[in-house]
Amino acid sequence: IATHTLPCRCKLCGKAFSRPWLLNGHIRTHTGEKPFSCQHCSRAFA
């Protein structure tokens, strides 16, 4: 039983999230964006 609301919905796949920042992180799975990089090896991460 869900006890909280999920007001933030992905326009691409319909998955719902409780917080906007969780949705923003999820959208990276669709765009392939990797905004964080390692200072030692320069490898990028989402």
Swiss-Prot record:
InterPro entries with a match to the protein in the record: Snail/Krueppel_Znf, Znf_C2H2_sf, Znf_C2H2_type
One Gene Ontology term of the molecular function aspect: zinc ion binding
A single Gene Ontology CC term: nucleus
Zn finger (C2H2-type) location: 1-4, 8-30, 36-46
Cross-referenced SUPFAM superfamilies: beta-beta-alpha zinc fingers
Disulfide-bond pairs as recorded: none
Subcellular location: Nucleus
Main subcellular localisation: nucleus
Signal peptide residue numbers: none
Alphabetized Pfam families for the sequence: zf-C2H2 (PF00096)
This protein's UniProt keywords: DNA-binding, Metal-binding, Nucleus, Repeat, Zinc, Zinc-finger
Family named by the database record: Belongs to the snail C2H2-type zinc-finger protein family.
Name used for this protein in its record: Escargot/snail protein homolog
Taxonomic path: Eukaryota, Metazoa, Ecdysozoa, Arthropoda, Chelicerata
